[in-house]
Every structure is written in structure tokens, then in C-alpha cells.
Amino acid sequence: MRLRKFVLALGFLDACRSGPTPLRLGTTYTVQQSAALAVLESLWTGPPPLATVVAPSGQILRAAANGDLEVVITHAPALEQRLLVAPGHALLRCPLAASRFAVVGPATDPARVATAATAAEAFRRIASAGAPFVSRGDSSGTHVKEVALWRAAGVTPAPRWYLESGTDQAATLHLADERGAYALADLPTYAKLGGLASRILFAADTALTNPYTLYVVRRAEPNPAARVFATWATHAGREAILALRLPDGTPAFVRQPGDCAVSAKP
């Protein structure tokens, strides 16, 4: 509800502003905190300018379904399908880029996560050890992935060792760091923060791939600029995102296969 009020307030400000009406872009905290959003905003020259809303993927997708946003970039494939694609709210679907999730935690690694064979096993070891784990707990793409990993591990997290922060990726990682706890992290965001005592303990599983997809939202009054932005973002914008590097010099993001495709209305 708070997000919708904020987006509606943006609309009021747009109506009071002279010049082109801004394009309403909704995206996630990991896009913002990994520097990918700053890259897009700095290179997009319009017209029109961007009016960007940042929130967890679940909130962004619901706002898009309500018609409050024109373009979204999210990283929760199952939620995207359920909230945007299946009901017919997506006009255009464009694979953008992918990063990687990792299990981070204390250097002592009491749950022996670093020697796990799979991400599910890493989560199972955390539960077996009763080691503290900090979750975002906010219906973000990161939280959705985490829940899927607990399910794959056959584990229901227990309150005595499991804490939901209810906040963004950066704040969650800082909280986990303070408590010597494990957490699921988007690698580019973790790298951008720097200065954390937490270490990357496990990332070697294709289940930890983190795909970002851009959607042009189907609206009663479509904004032609939304398609223009989508084309730009998946070409020049994407190349700039792919140029971002982790501290070890490896790419922070890799290319997502596939081109923009019209999403049929059911």
C-alpha cells in the first residue's frame, strides 16, 4: 500500500511538472545496490526522463499489475509468471542479465557450508547446526530464492536460529555481519558493500543463478517510450551493465540468452 501511494504521488508530481512526463520504472534493491541502476540512469538520456521506484520484486510486480508502473526490472521468475505474465499484464518480456547468489557467513563457518556439494546441502547444514541465518523476509527476489532453497533442502527454518530482517539486501547483510550469521547474498551487492567480516562461502551451483528480466507493462494507455527504453536497455544499457566487475575482476553480470518477445494476452 505504501508503495502504491508513493507511485501515485509520483504521478501527481508528473502532472505538475513541465516537459515530458517521466517514464515510470520499477526495480529492485539489488539492481540499485549493485550499481546496475546507477549505470542505466546515468546513460539514459531520454526523452523522457526516468522516475524510478525501488522496492522488493514482489511489491514492484504488484504495482505493475495495478498499472502503476510502465517498465519493471525484477529477478523473481516464479513471481513474474504468476503476477505479471499469466494474468496478461506483461506486454513485452526482455531477458536482461544475470548475476549470482552466494551463501555468505562467518569466516569460521560453523555449519561447514564451504564444503557442501550443492546449495540445498549448504542450507541443510545451516539448519542441522542451528547456525544463525538472517533472511530478508520481504517477498524480494532474494527472499523467493532463499525460500526455494530451504524447500529443496527439505527444511523449515526454526525461529531459534532464523531471523527475518524485513529490509533490503544491504541492510540484511550488515545485520548478518553484526550477528555472525549466514545469509543469501546477491554477489554484486555484497561486493559493492565492502568492509564486511562475512565471507563468500558457497556459490558453485547453477541453482544460485540470479536472472534479471525487463518487462514493458500492458496498460490501457501505453507509453511508446516504454518500448524505446526496453530496446535501449537490452542493447547499450545491457552492455554497460555487463562491463561491471567484481573485486577479483570477474564480471558482476553475464548476458541472459534470448531477445525481447511479445507476451500474449490470455
What do these predicted regions represent?
Residues 10-11:
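Processing junctions and N-termini across compartments
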Residues 14-15:
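C-terminal motif of bacterial Sec signal peptides marking the signal peptidase cleavage site
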Residues 18-47, 58, 62-68, 76-77, ...:
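Exported/periplasmic ABC-transporter solute-binding proteins
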Residues 50:
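Hydrophobic anchor at the start of a short beta-strand
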Residues 70-71, 91-103:
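Short, glycine-/small- and polar/acidic-enriched structural segments
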